[in-house]
Amino acid sequence: MELSSVSSFSLGTNPFISIPHNNNNNLKVSSYCCKSKSRVINSTNSKHCSPNNNNNNNTSNKTTHLLGLYGQSRCLLKPLSIFSCKDQRGNSIRASAQIEDRPPESGNLSALTNVKDFVSVCWEYVRPYTAKGVIICSSCLFGRELLENPNLFSWPLIFRALLGMLAILGSCFYTAGINQIFDMDIDRINKPDLPLVSGRISVESAWLLTLSPAIIGFILILKLNSGPLLTSLYCLAILSGTIYSVPPFRWKKNPITAFLCILMIHAGLNFSVYYASRAALGLAFVWSPSFSFITAFITFMTLTLASSKDLSDINGDRKFGVETFATKLGAKNITLLGTGLLLLNYVAAISTAIIWPKAFKSNIMLLSHAILAFSLFFQARELDRTNYTPEACKSFYEFIWILFSAEYVVYLFI
């Protein structure tokens, strides 16, 4: 018998398939391809099948049957289900073994994980790069006074210094938090991954994380008997952070007033830590050459920080009418301007070491500022290669903060 059939069917339709009417004939089907329900399966088989004792050219009658879903399941799904069930059974056994081998998670471990996640989100909320800069700044200013007066060291003094640094961090956390609360619409465009706009913390939690550090810092200032000057400087830092972000002031909307706010915050931080350090050691306030240098350097460096902070925020600032140096001049021009100002600052530091070799340790001044200047140059060139993408601009601004911290480390040894 000669059987020639062309079958086209899928698991999602009712196919026509040609089969012989005589069930006594031995049929050999060459191949068929069974894939997913969304694909049409075509199989073309052409074979010559003859009985052993019959060599005539007569062919059997061919009957076309309509096979429905039940017929399909018998023809196609049953062979597949054998292998599928076998695989599923093997997978189930392996999965069960893995579950049995896995140690049960204790309640203490789960609670510890939740606490770690919460602390991580809070740390991200307060802008880690600014917090690190404040910690290094405070530590180095106080450490320099201890290096010059090692005989005045005492552990109670270190404890008071740590409490004072916590108070300063309170104002820092407030400034970072209040800015995020009132910039939510802008940050949805500029920084959608921030904890507040991404929904990882609620607005209520954000207010708690913003106001609590400011209040705790103020209480610490009072408990340390810091005096009216340091208390006023702390309040000035809180006021500067408020008028920078909160309507109707929003000094951040103007590049000049924004720079003034940032200058007040950094100058106040620099002066207050130095003044408090000498007062705690029982020393009178003096404008030493090293402190005069770091004050002048950080003041000019604030220009670079103020101009570079909005490089990654151009799109959102333009949409909401916030005028910055970056929106006015563009990311490339601001980068060139800020880099140029900071490079001039480094040149001035090197020149200072050459002109007044007795007032400073010239070798350290020359080498350290040369290294920092070259690192700034290469970082600016790398930013230019990326065509000033928001991510690259953000990294560049954070690198400026690294240079900010590095300058205080240099201050320890000059």
UniProtKB/Swiss-Prot annotation:
Record-annotated disulphide pairs: none
Keywords per UniProt: Chloroplast, Membrane, Plastid, Transferase, Transit peptide, Transmembrane, Transmembrane helix
UniProt KW Transit peptide keyword: yes
Topology of the protein relative to the lipid bilayer: Multi-pass membrane protein
InterPro entries with a match to the protein in the record: AtHST-like, UbiA_prenyltransferase, UbiA_sf
Enzyme Commission numbers on file: 2.5.1.136
Cofactor(s) demanded: Mg(2+)
Enzyme superclass (EC): transferase
Origin superkingdom: Eukaryota
Transmembrane segments: 153-173, 201-221, 229-249, 256-276, 281-301, 336-356, 359-379, 394-414
Annotated Gene Ontology cellular component terms: chloroplast membrane
Regulation: Stimulated by CHIL2 but inhibited by CHIL1.
Pathway the protein acts in: Secondary metabolite biosynthesis
One Pfam entry name: UbiA
GO molecular function: prenyltransferase activity
Tissue: Expressed in trichomes.
Record family assignment: Belongs to the UbiA prenyltransferase family.
Name of protein: 2-acylphloroglucinol 4-prenyltransferase
Source organism of the structure: Humulus lupulus (European hop)
